[in-house]
Amino acid sequence: MKLLYTDMSQDLTEILTEQASSYAQKGKRVFYIAPSALSFEKERKVLEYLPQSASFDITVTRFTQMARYFILNTSNPKTQLDDTGLAMIFYKVLLHMGDDELKVYGRLRKDSNFINQLVDLYKELQQANMTVLDLQHLDQVEKQEDLVRIFSAAQDLLLAGDFDNQSKLSAFFKEITSGHLDEALSNTVLVIDGFTRFSAEEEALVALLNDKCHQIVVGTYTSQKAYKANFVYGNAYQASVDFLRTLAQTYKVIPDYVTTDKEGNLSFARISRLLESRHDFSTVDETVTEQDKHALKVWEVVNQKEEVAQVAKSIRQLLADGKRYKDILVLLGDEESYKLHVGQIFRKFDIPYYFGKEESMSSHPLVEFVDSLERIKRYNYRAEDLLNLVKSGLYGGFAQEDLDLFEYYVNFADIKGRHKFLSDFTANSRDKYNLDQINALRSQLIEPLDKFLNSRKQKGSSLLKKLVVFLEAVQLPSQMFELSTKASEAEKEQNEQVWKAFTHILEQVETIFGDESLSVDDFLSILRSGMLACDYRTVPATVDVVNVKKYDLIQPHSAPYVFALGMTQSHFPKVGQNKSLLSDEERSRINEATDEHRRLDIVTQINSKRGHFVAMSLFNAASEQLVLSQPQIINESQDDMSVYLKELLDLGIPLVEKGRNRFEAKGDQIGNYRDLLSTVIALNSSHLDLDLDKETQTFWSVAVRYLRKRLDKDQVLIPKVIDDVTTTKVDDQVMQLVFPEEEPLKLSATALTTFYNNQYLYFLRYVLELEELESIHPDARHHGTYLHRVFERVMGDSSSESFDDKLEKAIAQTNQDQPFEILYTEDQESRFSRQILEDIARSTASVLRDNAAVKVECEEVKFDLLLANSIKITGIIDRVDRLTDGALGVVDYKTGKNVFDIQKFYNGLSPQLVTYLEALRQTYKVDADQLFGAMYLHMQVPQLNLSQIGLEKLAAQAHKELTYKGLFVASETEHLTGGNYDLQKTVTYDKEDLETLLDYNIKLFRSAAEVIRSGNFAINPYTEDGKSVQGDQIKSITHFEADRHMGQARKLLRLPKKGKKEAYLELMAKTEEENQMQVSENTISFPVIDHAVRVDKKDQEDNHVD
């Protein structure tokens, strides 16, 4: 064995390539061994350093792959299993064990994470040259017994099924020991590069090969100073020194310090020596130079997005300076959190990149198909799982419209569970749904699915056949083919990989579970676990790309230019954690009890020395320039600076603050035109009225000049940013169809309120007739109808029974009404709602019990009022009461709190009670002095704060809550005094005032009708204070934003509280000619002062929102 080491300023790969080339020239077969994660990069570098750029006698590979070269022709009839197959073996083993057989792991028998941990431990034991019987001295005897029982059963199953139960290196080891490979190995040379430690399995193999091979050359990085030091704990090179010394002592070899004629980057060499001296507590007569500060830079950026953008700009500048993409390497401290930012921003900057990380297949439609299938069975046909299955794009050739209809109905009827999906759908809403069509669709969707999922427990091979029949029934193969025909080349390759993984898993299921009795649940669980564990194999599309990977796999001299992102304390150094079934203490005790070449790794024990060595490798990763960057905020939380970056700052490396506020008139600050375009657009929405300093003005003048030239060259037109949300006039044909000219316009108090809330909301509801998603479950509308029906029956019962008996009978009869019986017996939630409604009915009914002054004239009175033959006002009055003097009044039942507010009425937002009084006036042909008022009765259980109300006042306060609230005629209040009426001065009106209210209400209807007939519906939700919007903005449709479109909101007229009623009445009394209010983009007749918003007619013509 030959041991070599060199400084990190030297290129060890070049040195070892020369060694390999010299042995190859002597006729030796050379295997250049690198760690698995670095074998591809090592192969590229070795080929670059070979004089002839290629050699048939030199093979760059890894230990396991090298073993295959020697045992490839060795007969091995046993079936090979990958990790998915091993997981199936353990699943099968645990399937036959009961919870009581495993004292520690009994509850985890079917947990996929536990099974994956068993697979990892199985492979780790192979790498440690151990068996499960070596797992002595565990914390619990029961734990040891469980693991021995599981692994012994798995080993028996592997032997019985004639599966290969040994690793590639174990098979190679046996072949070497047998002497079959002596001749081949005698002409073999191993060159080992990139290691600072061997696994126990690799260590034993190297020991065996040392006696058989012609030569083994091992090289690593360390300094002469570090290797010769007496004390290396905490040294920057501790990992490699320990590695070298162990090999030297084992094989009685003196390591040789080697160099090349090429001089490395002096700056990185000097910084390495300075850092080394800080860790070995020595002094060096060197300091950081200006050249060093240019070669190694430390950035601090606000967040990850800005950090990646700064790197992208620097890459674009390097390209402008003549560099190639392949000369640039980007390293990440946290791959997962940076992956999205790197992808989005690099694409914006037109930077091709290769992310050297396997991507999970979990988001592919076929994996979602299998996942949904398993979840449907596990959760008994949960609606969301079934809908995910049918919407995967692989389930049958159903039209998207049919799937949308099915989804809409399932959500409406709240279909859950197998029984409901197998039964005919019967729920309907005003015959809105074509149940025949939906049930036919249900049968096509559910029948093949249930036929498979309802299969009894049987052999795995039989279930596989049924699965194939099911997949053909739902046209999965043809749908996969259809998916690929519309895909890009990259997507086609992914589809091919997913399909190959799927069929491979099915083959392994056939092999392992073919004769095993399986339930559908277990069968699908096995498929799901296998598919979710699969990853795409990624290969760069071209060599000339920016490579992106995690930093802890870095080697010195990886690229000329290196950017390391996310170098915060949490990620640099990266602290390894033990997530296996064996704790660190257990591993330590096991290692103490075993002999040489048999060892379990203890990750936490090597964190410190591994972190130091990775840091030194990172600081020497670039040959020209290295940038280390840290964001202040990473993963939405603040993080501290890494200790290694602090050491660099202590040495004199300056901290460069990078950010978008550093404006400079330089090309590298502009980056490329796509980024500049997005920056200009972002700036366009900022505060442009701020004064810019001279430096910033210079930057933007250069940037805009560059952008204009580029846009003119590429003939790119920037669309105008529209700050208005105006609408276009509805087509006359549509208006004629919805509101025929020969018929009066139909309006109700609710429609009028909607109009004055937001005209566009009226357009959506009453012109387009859009509706919100319905539900079979009762909501506030159903609750209100239920209580209405109860009170109708109570008030209409003229029998001699007591009031309480009448109430209970009315509740019982209402409960038996078919619509309510269906609604309120659907499930426990519905029954609970009915119970609450019954309590509300009993509480509210106390208001009706003792009211001798009032007689119920009639209930549920429908009315149609015709105004000037052009407007037809419709509605239903819940109850009409008559006083002993003959005066009439209106009662409207409400489940929520409503009061008559004259301010809201004036602004068109509370016309209901006045409209009902107008209906009484015209229906009964009476004058205003024959009306006593209109009021709301809140149907509720009073809720009182006991901490603010004493027990002695509790009954009175509860009674006060149950009162009629509305507007009353002052002359009739004497008949109402003592009753349950809220007769405050602010809600009592004399005859003249009531006439004013009634006349003004008609003007509200006429003004609204004029706008509706015009077909111009403005997006004008109302605002009370001009600062916030209270009206319905319908943002998802109109894109109305209060901060940008406040000018288009309708501002309500608000008057001081003192004398408010009289002031509003005075305004209402004025003539329509003297008081006009604009409620749309055109000035229309409307009786309020000028508080509306004018919308420029030209803008309306130019900018349309459909």
Swiss-Prot record:
GO MF annotations, alphabetized: 5'-3' exonuclease activity; ATP binding; double-stranded DNA binding; helicase activity; hydrolase activity, acting on acid anhydrides
Keyword Lipoprotein belongs to the record: no
Domain of life, source organism: Bacteria
UniProt entry keywords in alphabetical sequence: ATP-binding, DNA damage, DNA repair, DNA-binding, Exonuclease, Helicase, Hydrolase, Nuclease, Nucleotide-binding
Protein family (similarity comment): Belongs to the helicase family. AddB/RexB type 2 subfamily.
NCBIfam families given in the database record: rexB_recomb
InterPro entries, per database record: ADDB_N (IPR049035), DNA_helicase_suRexB (IPR014141), P-loop_NTPase (IPR027417), PDDEXK-like_dom_sf (IPR011604), PDDEXK_AddAB-type (IPR038726), Restrct_endonuc-II-like (IPR011335)
One of the Pfam families matching this protein, by short name: PDDEXK_1
Annotated protein name in UniProt: ATP-dependent helicase/deoxyribonuclease subunit B
GO-annotated biological processes: double-strand break repair via homologous recombination
EC number: 3.1.-.-
Protein task: The heterodimer acts as both an ATP-dependent DNA helicase and an ATP-dependent, dual-direction single-stranded exonuclease. Recognizes the chi site generating a DNA molecule suitable for the initiation of homologous recombination. This subunit has 5' -> 3' nuclease activity but not helicase activity.
Subunit structure: Heterodimer of AddA and RexB.
Misc. comment: Despite having helicase-like domains, this subunit does not have helicase activity.
Cofactor requirements of the protein: Mg(2+)
